């Protein structure tokens, strides 16, 4: 028998120019010594118990690694504070920044205009503030006092003893997490987790009223958004579920259900929160300026190291355009600088072909460019788009765009000081970002809320102490919105969010009727086989899965009583794809081909054609390729899932390849099979495929094989 190997991707050319395409993938070496490109997806999960208590030592491992860098940061801060000649230092710093080059200068895909914009916005120059009259400062705010019951005041002016206590518990690895759950719908619950400094501290669930009227908004926002009268009836059911976590400044991971309606609804709410936060921050500073004028010896701690306070991370320019447009709409400001430029660079009125699935058409509509960093500055009367990053209140970016600034190949040109004082971070459409390069998101978290390396005209007499003490991460609010919760999403919430106010996440109870296996539209044998991990750790899971594949699945392919050809092997992880491909090439005589997200058009076309003709018996197919292309692969008679798809829609789309073959008379549904390999760590994906109750049985039941039809 002639053996066919993979098509052209056996070796990765290390000499290629390191452009934007390379930055979308991560290189690492596996046991077979071959370079591997894959999204780096750590695994984590959170139990849904009514009340649980555990000590999360794993989440604190990074604390010890940061001790050395903290000492250096404090040293740099003391040097700045003791500087006798700040004018000379500032002139020298500006001279250096005039020579700053775009971090993406090695990327030949970026236009000169894009490079110039990034370069210009990184140069820290003194901003021109609008002169503020006394009437402007008090206009519309006569009924707005600094109320301690306002979450904005109570959260950011929290007693330092509470912050110091929790900070020390993190450092000493003595934190304790306590959780509780409330039901917000027949099939949806909200789970609240709070990190405490010790077991003796009391735990109680925060209030969940579901009313916007419970939270004070700036008067100009009420007027612009018709909220002067009743504010309760204006909220949708989805908004009532998340309004309290958002406006109480708690972290939130929310899994929504509808691509169009739900995204629009949660954006309406968080944009209102963003504007309220920015307006209150700026008004507080301006009022304190007046107080200082009459009382020069007064102490007013109301600032961070730098001006930017909000960071919104989005996958594409189209999503960013929708977000910024909503910010403009709800701001109550009529003057918007460079609005036409925003439309020219971010908006495209295009849609993918109607033959593609609805989710694909939504994800890839409009401008799908994933490189952008946009500064937005607010004054009393105007919004200034494309503002200098250090003079911006809001920064909207893609992971790739910010990565090229934070991780410049020239270490001297790297910058992250503009992220030092972020108090509100929002990740929109995490499900799409995960299919880009999720490691860029981890890079952003690593650079957040660090003590800046330079002064940036900071008035240290007004910097809050928890900034000076490098405790800003404990006050930062992080909001994450995703279509499907994955281990990556849980890892971000549990491992990267340390909000002293605690964190919320929702959980949907998937019924049998809502599961993927019930929505196929035809009957076919679906076999789920569990990999026994024993007492193995999460790190060892890929090895156990691979051994199961080579010892159980491969023999079933060679000795199958069903079809010998038309076998589609679906592999979600690119590292697993490389490993399986090498094994089939070196250790078996199976005729196979492979297509992945790095295959060129010619290879994609020829390999699919050979598979349809039966000249290739097995076709290796990656999840990222399916996400970006949604091919209609012909000639599929059986499907093997190396791991359950993270997106349940992918399960149905791939299995329906068999249904289309049966419709054309190329296969018999009584002979065709679908085989899915899973472990107990795949519970999140299994829930959406087989339902919540069945997933619990599959992951913890006595049997290791379950069949559906």
Curated annotation (Swiss-Prot):
Q: Which residues form the signal peptide?
A: none
**Skewed-composition ranges (Acidic residues):** 37-66, 105-116, 126-150
What GO molecular function annotations does the UniProt record carry, in alphabetical order? Answer: rRNA binding; U3 snoRNA binding
User: Which cellular compartments is it found in?
Assistant: Nucleus, Nucleolus
Family (UniProt): Belongs to the UTP25 family.
- What does it do? DEAD-box RNA helicase-like protein required for pre-18S rRNA processing, specifically at sites A0, A1, and A2.
Its protein name is U3 small nucleolar RNA-associated protein 25
Q: Which organism is it from?
A: Zygosaccharomyces rouxii (strain ATCC 2623 / CBS 732 / NBRC 1130 / NCYC 568 / NRRL Y-229)
